[in-house]
């Protein structure tokens, strides 16, 4: 999972690599259409026409689809949950809070967050390996407040699903050397449950190619650390051009693997933390 600072990003931004900025008029037009659609949904909801409401949402999927390339550009083309490009299949614009119906842990259904169907702050990029299994799954902690259109309180809900636009949620994730996504050491029981349920529902460990790719990244970084330490030892007694060149080579490769745009950069960073090589850790501080 990679943190996306969605709150402070707009399609009009001109500093997003690989993205051609929208004009302010384009963005204003998109927001205006969103507002119109939500007003129409509200009228259908008030009239008790839930099926028509949901049909209107489905009929306008192209509206959130218009933001897909911008959302992908924010992560360098990576899925926000798996942090890979092709291994997690093609990408969907996923609604963090389900738009039509929401399911609890036991499968019980409640009405969805239809008023957020066209709210870009509810959009995430997810490969369909995970998105198809997630569906409307959105359980809340027992006793949590539950937002409704008449009593909105999304900020006070306690969802199981980890959110890539919440830096605190992203910080709950760690990895092991076998490529498995695990809870961060020292996490509370509730935090561990959130990680476990998110991993299970989005197939973040079950999808074998993804776990194998993580293991490969871990092994690459682990080998680079060994090379770095061996070269550093050779330099300890004085000048050694070959060893010095090796240090520079390793540093360059570590920078590449831990760069935000790299696939599974969070795995590479965590491996460095686990191995606790101070000089290499400085490269990603």
Q: Where in this protein do the model-derived segments appear?
A:
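Generic beta-strand structural signal
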Residues: 77, 114, 121-125, 158, ...
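A general structural signal for short secondary-structure junctions and capping/turn motifs
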Residues: 69-72, 83, 115-118, 152-153, ...
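A boundary/linker detector
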Residues: 1-65, 87, 281-285
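C-terminal, charged low-complexity interaction regions
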Residues: 5, 183-285
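Histidine-centered nuclease catalytic patch
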Residues: 84-129, 133-150
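Short, charged surface segments at domain edges that flank catalytic/cofactor-binding sites
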Residues: 32-78, 102-117, 121, 144
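Acidic, metal/cofactor-coordinating or nucleic-acid-engaging core segments within structured domains
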Residues: 132-137, 141, 167-168, 202-216
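Long, low-complexity, intrinsically disordered segments enriched in glycines and aromatic residues
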Residues: 141-188
